[in-house]
Amino acid sequence: MEKRIVCLAGDGVGPEVMESAKEVLHMVERLYGHHFHLQDEHFGGVAIDLTGQPLPQRTLAACLASDAVLLGAVGGPRWDGAKERPEKGLLALRKGLGVFANVRPVTVESETAHLSPLKKADEIDFVVVRELTGGIYFSYPKERTDEVATDTLTYHRHEIERIVSYAFQLASKRKKKVTSIDKANVLESSKLWRTVTEEVALRYPDVELEHILVDAAAMELIRNPGRFDVIVTENLFGDILSDEASVLAGSLGMLPSASHAEKGPSLYEPIHGSAPDIAGKNKANPIAMMRSVAMMLGQSFGLTREGCAIEEAISAVLKSGKCTEDIGGTETTTSFTKAVMQEMEEQALVGRGR
């Protein structure tokens, strides 16, 4: 298989974890006979420094022409006073690609469960599906005076139906349960959200649906996260709750994410930030980036076996006691990546010997 992947290393630790992603992809090429054209493009703060824009037109054009996009990290205090903020480029990239579904799997390795703030963290295994294109971030009018500020929250039926349908399709391949999170006791947009969700649910009789108000959901994520399978919610609620959920893993360096469009390339990235305090020190945890690669292989390219091989290698290395500083170990970014690649190679040899 041949695929073109645009690599947006970005800022902070982004270039370091992107290098890990590339090395893992090269190992997949060698072990399974695929070929990936990896195209580097400027994005975020580094793009501002070079072009004055966080998302240069050349970068967006390259992304649109690709089969998938990998993003390292974006932003940092260096650009706090800049006219253009790096994070603005991420919103523009999502809009340009037309991605509407942000997918964050939240799982906890038994080897790192002790790092979670919760007891029985190894029972956590759910996915947060967040709507990305509507809601309060993208609705108008928006206005502010010295005395009054106004934001508008708008959702169209087709936006709700599209994201909820995606969540049900995902749940039908997992534990067959969807939890829809809204504020239907107060917000008109949430009342429509709930109505459309119930209509979609009729098409999936084998999938259980439950509704939870967002304030109760925030509590349940901490009190009983094992109850969840697929969570689906609107943009603002999803932004907040997915960050809350990510803390359950004990380190932001562990979890990947994907953003999908109806047509065209998807965007894959670790959920962690640019971590400027450790940038360039070979300390960044590359697991989330490597898992983003695994998601890309499975979800965009249909290479489920190859994606699983990466996941299994990561788990095996963690079981051996090797891990980076953020999860209690002494491995560097490069040494942990090397260990994962070695494990992938060994597992492939064992598989061929059967």
From Swiss-Prot:
The keyword Ligase does not apply. One of its GO terms (biological process) is L-leucine biosynthetic process. It comes from the Bacteria. Binds 1 Mg(2+) or Mn(2+) ion per subunit. The keyword Membrane does not apply. Pathway: Amino-acid biosynthesis; L-leucine biosynthesis; L-leucine from 3-methyl-2-oxobutanoate: step 3/4. It is found in: Cytoplasm. NAD(+) binds at residues 76-87, 273-285. Keywords: Amino-acid biosynthesis, Branched-chain amino acid biosynthesis, Cytoplasm, Leucine biosynthesis, Magnesium, Manganese, Metal-binding, NAD, Oxidoreductase. Pfam families: Iso_dh (PF00180). GO terms for molecular function: 3-isopropylmalate dehydrogenase activity; magnesium ion binding; NAD binding. It catalyses: (2R,3S)-3-isopropylmalate + NAD(+) = 4-methyl-2-oxopentanoate + CO2 + NADH. One of its GO terms (cellular component) is cytosol. Substrate binds at residues 94, 104, 130, 215. Gene3D superfamilies: Isopropylmalate Dehydrogenase. Its EC number is 1.1.1.85. Mg(2+) binds at residues 215, 239, 243. Its cofactor is Mg(2+); Mn(2+). The record marks 137, 183 as: Important for catalysis. Homodimer. Belongs to the isocitrate and isopropylmalate dehydrogenases family. LeuB type 1 subfamily. Catalyzes the oxidation of 3-carboxy-2-hydroxy-4-methylpentanoate (3-isopropylmalate) to 3-carboxy-4-methyl-2-oxopentanoate. The product decarboxylates to 4-methyl-2 oxopentanoate. This is 3-isopropylmalate dehydrogenase. It comes from Bacillus cereus (strain ZK / E33L). The gene is leuB.
